[in-house]
Amino acid sequence: MSLPRFDPAEYETQLAAKIARFKSDFAPLDLPEPEVFRSEPLHYRLRAEFRIWHSEGRLDYAMFDPADPKRPVLIDGFPAAAAPIAAAMPVLRERVMASEPLRRKLFQVEFLATLSGELMISLVYHRPLEADWEAAARELAAAMGVQLIGRSRKQKIVLERDWVLESFELDGRTLHYQQIEGSFSQPNGGVNRQMLVWARRQAEGSGADLLELYCGNGNFTVALAPLFGKVLATEMSKSSVRAAHYNLAANAVDNVTMVRMASEEISDALAGGRAYRRMQGIDLAGYRFGTLFVDPPRSGLDEATVALARRFDRILYISCNPQTLHDNIAALRDTHGIAAAAAFDQFPYTHHLECGVLLQKTAA
């Protein structure tokens, strides 16, 4: 696969091809007509990273084409990048080129932006960072008005903070999310907001309680929690759990219990398996679970989690891999059918498609 071309004139054509493939692949599973949620055709990506190419005193941003991975493709800009990233790229390059402490052995640059306009830049080096780097970096951060981090092997220098704060309006609420450097956050902010709206619409009227697996930094948790009595949310990443606690407090969400456990562990606990230390103080018998929400990694749900899912009347499933979503739905066909479906174009001009389904229990 080659590097994507970012041509707005081709946007609808490339999206139509992905939707057609989704509908064809899922037709044997009785897929209803999916809602389609489009991305902005340009400046949609809130995360980006680039290698830095040094040549005769000049620095350039570089990407690598999977079709020719050893040859760098030098770029002046990145049309997919969100506006704060696109505006910062040329300024950063010129300022770093003019500063020997910032330029020397700079290997990679990583950007993390928000819909609300914040920007964090991580500069990654192949050398230890010393006092001269920090002094130059503080000048750069102040001049550009960004959060700046320096990293090298076994070293990380955070000038102010290693996170940005996302804020946006959703169904009459202003939501706030801490997004930590190096932790997962949704790359396409506009499409993410559409996913939250769709998920809330499917969850309305569910009542009872919610079990959420793979909750990350609480992206969906914060949006969905007001629609349920109580929520039990699980996540394995320590940094994501910290961010989730921050985000729940920042949004005044007080009906969520977070536990750092893998999906197979919570499946075992709910099935009456062994006692887990991290579940101490949590009264599982006090929950009336009616809905399961999952947003798993590309590998999808394991067998234990599929077995757990069978016990729920409603399963809300967001997937970044249609193939494993297909396999999981096929495994649940004896108990659940697809009541609603959606396609989210998180990654325009690529073959990737984010999908959402609501599965409703059809048999005891």
From Swiss-Prot:
Residues annotated as binding S-adenosyl-L-methionine: 186, 214, 219, 235, 295
Enzyme Commission (EC) number: 2.1.1.-, 2.1.1.35
UniProt xrefs under Pfam families: tRNA_U5-meth_tr
Coiled coil: none
Catalysis: reaction(s): uridine(54) in tRNA + S-adenosyl-L-methionine = 5-methyluridine(54) in tRNA + S-adenosyl-L-homocysteine + H(+); uridine(341) in tmRNA + S-adenosyl-L-methionine = 5-methyluridine(341) in tmRNA + S-adenosyl-L-homocysteine + H(+)
Keywords from the UniProt entry: Methyltransferase, S-adenosyl-L-methionine, Transferase, tRNA processing
Cellular component GO terms, alphabetical: cytosol
GO biological process, one term: tRNA methylation
InterPro entries noted in UniProt: MeTrfase_TrmA_AS, MeTrfase_TrmA_CS, SAM-dependent_MTases_sf, TrmA_MeTrfase, U5_MeTrfase_fam
GO molecular-function terms, A-Z: rRNA binding; tRNA (uracil(54)-C5)-methyltransferase activity, S-adenosyl methionine-dependent; tRNA binding
Xref: SUPFAM superfamilies: S-adenosyl-L-methionine-dependent methyltransferases
PROSITE patterns recorded: SAM_MT_RNA_M5U, TRMA_1, TRMA_2
Location of the active site: 320, 354
Disulfide bond annotation, renumbered to this chain: none
Function: Dual-specificity methyltransferase that catalyzes the formation of 5-methyluridine at position 54 (m5U54) in all tRNAs, and that of position 341 (m5U341) in tmRNA (transfer-mRNA).
Sequence similarity: Belongs to the class I-like SAM-binding methyltransferase superfamily. RNA M5U methyltransferase family. TrmA subfamily.
PANTHER family with a match to the protein in the record: TRNA/TMRNA (URACIL-C(5))-METHYLTRANSFERASE, TRNA_TMRNA (URACIL-C(5))-METHYLTRANSFERASE
Name of the molecule in the record: tRNA/tmRNA (uracil-C(5))-methyltransferase
Organism this protein belongs to: Azoarcus sp. (strain BH72)
